[in-house]
Amino acid sequence: MLPPQKKPWESMAKGLVLGALFTSFLLLVYSYAVPPLHAGLASTTPEAAASCSPPALEPEAVIRANGSAGECQPRRNIVFLKTHKTASSTLLNILFRFGQKHRLKFAFPNGRNDFDYPTFFARSLVQDYRPGACFNIICNHMRFHYDEVRGLVPTNAIFITVLRDPARLFESSFHYFGPVVPLTWKLSAGDKLTEFLQDPDRYYDPNGFNAHYLRNLLFFDLGYDNSLDPSSPQVQEHILEVERRFHLVLLQEYFDESLVLLKDLLCWELEDVLYFKLNARRDSPVPRLSGELYGRATAWNMLDSHLYRHFNASFWRKVEAFGRERMAREVAALRHANERMRTICIDGGHAVDAAAIQDEAMQPWQPLGTKSILGYNLKKSIGQRHAQLCRRMLTPEIQYLMDLGANLWVTKLWKFIRDFLRW
């Protein structure tokens, strides 16, 4: 006698239950990987009074803003506010290499590659944090909270960040983060960015999940309200506060000039600021913003536009103080050294698609649902003199964090799930 066959609805019900349980599990994991946005400031760490107290501060460097010669000591205490889509991953690699070379102490996130972004930074988010702990370098993604950061580094720490033309940043952020911003899902056109910019108020909800990625992202990363009225006096007050807190604001569009100013500020060597462009996106089949759409994107991100204009002007004042001719010489030297390292280190001499990367250790983190981020293949025969530097210059952020001892269990779990589901 044949065993009784299961009814179709029973199999369907079991499938639905299993699917619901699995989906719930994924949502739980994702809630750890991407925490909900809180409108208010994170509560200040109770041990705020127990600020960083190093046994002895490093000698103060001579800040040579006027380009004059003078002895200085390399600066080793640095806070880098890593903003989104601004070539900040390339800067991160520079800081990782310097810190590793000099055995400096990093303040790493606990379990992830960011400090629970987009919530505000708090000292309790630092891996192995103890009251009074002191660090040399803080450089992972965070939503900036000055008082919390200030208490983790010596008083002579240098604060830096990097900005980008707000329209271009918005374009990059829209394409990169769009799949995890639900408000973009209702856009039907093949060119969703153009459709959005035709009437952004129709689609945008400031309280929507991950909505901060689509408006005034620089202002948001700096810890300010990205929905302020652009005519509010608070906007200029915040911009001036950034100017007081940060010793140098770099510009992505003038990256080499920015690195020359950074090298001078920190009293570093040329080798310390060599770089390869990391986390670069493959060219999109969608055309770049036209003149009209560029204007719309600029207007939509007006807070960031005010911020960028202010620091674009101050940047060129710093260049003038440094000396135009001197800047041209040092930029040329940096580019020559970068080109030399490219021929020594990179197989084929250029970045490649993810599918063409041969070493898993060189695979960059990819946005959800696509493999649009380029990476590199390391040459197989590199002389002993350059082998270590080449590998460090080409190592992606996640792998470098693990090499430096960061505990990335949440990030690794999320990667496992994504690989399993082929997201």
Curated annotation (Swiss-Prot):
**Gene name, Swiss-Prot/TrEMBL:** GAL3ST1
InterPro entries reported in the protein's UniProt record: Gal-3-0_sulfotransfrase, P-loop_NTPase
TM region(s), chain numbering: 15-35
Q: How does it sit in the membrane?
A: Single-pass type II membrane protein
Q: At which residues is glycosylation annotated?
A: 66, 312
Q: Where in the cell is it found?
A: Golgi apparatus membrane
What's its job?
Answer: Catalyzes the transfer of a sulfate group to position 3 of non-reducing beta-galactosyl residues in glycerolipids and sphingolipids, therefore participates in the biosynthesis of sulfoglycolipids. Catalyzes the synthesis of galactosylceramide sulfate (sulfatide), a major lipid component of the myelin sheath and of monogalactosylalkylacylglycerol sulfate (seminolipid), present in spermatocytes. Seems to prefer beta-glycosides at the non-reducing termini of sugar chains attached to a lipid moiety.
- List the source organism: Homo sapiens
Its EC top class is transferase
**Mind telling me what this protein is named?**
Galactosylceramide sulfotransferase
